[in-house]
Amino acid sequence: MIVPIFFLFSLLFSSSHGAIQDFCVADYSAPQGPAGYSCKNPAKVTVDNFVYSGLGITGNTTNLIKAAVTTAFDNQFPGVNGLGISLARPDLAPGGVIPFHTHPGASEIIIVIEGSLCAAFVSSDNKVYLKSLKKGDTMIFPSGLLHFQLNAGKNNALFFVAFNSPNPGLQLVDYALFGNDLATELVAAASFLDPAEIKRLKAVLGGSG
């Protein structure tokens, strides 16, 4: 029952509604504009445009953050284009983390399917909202606020995420600071971090400068 209820949540979470036409399946052959993808000719739309099977596959967590995120955004799932909804599936190995990040274009709601999580977001006045989550728990992360999810347990963790946008955007704080080519001296001046530590993190995260 958990997953069907979650899908209902994702629909209620949407703030966008098709007022002019029933749907706007993404036309990947047309140029993408600021408002998203153009609509596919309805005569060429099939039921397969509204079905996506990618979230049934376990992600590969053999990486630096011991986590994988499989997305069902408008660039993978054409049916969500224009509907104001999308989904994602994060898999976290023990010790895995989705590091501090923001979604500039969307709020999100998660539901834990397997394992447990430590999750938090930080408000604009720097207040932390932290909670340990278990199977079946849900948590909301307001749009644009820094947040993270950590698997502090001994078993793998799986949760699903719903967004009120077909493409919520993503900025990881660590990569924004250290995965770029901004000069170390400037990063140090702007962040108060030690230059040696900045260079170390740039090397780890693929930055330069």
Swiss-Prot record:
Q: Where in the cell is it found?
A: Secreted, Extracellular space, Apoplast
GO cellular component, as recorded:
apoplast
Disulfide-bonded cysteine pairs: these are C24-C39
Q: Where is the signal peptide?
A: 1-18
Any one GO MF term held by the record is:
manganese ion binding
What does the record say about pH dependence?
Antibacterial activity retained between pH 7 and 10.
**Principal subcellular localisation of the protein:** secreted
**How does temperature influence activity?**
Antibacterial activity retained between 10 and 70 degrees Celsius.
| Similarity remark | Belongs to the germin family.
Per the entry, what this protein does is: Has antibacterial activity against B.subtilis (MIC=5 ug), B.cereus (MIC=50 ug), A.hydrophila (MIC=2.5 ug), S.marcescens(MIC=10 ug), S.enterica (MIC=10 ug), P.entomophila (MIC=2.5 ug) and P.rhodesiae (MIC=10 ug). Has antifungal activity against F.solani KACC 40384 and F.oxysporum KACC 40032. Probably has no oxalate oxidase activity even if the active site is conserved.
- Name of protein: Germin-like protein
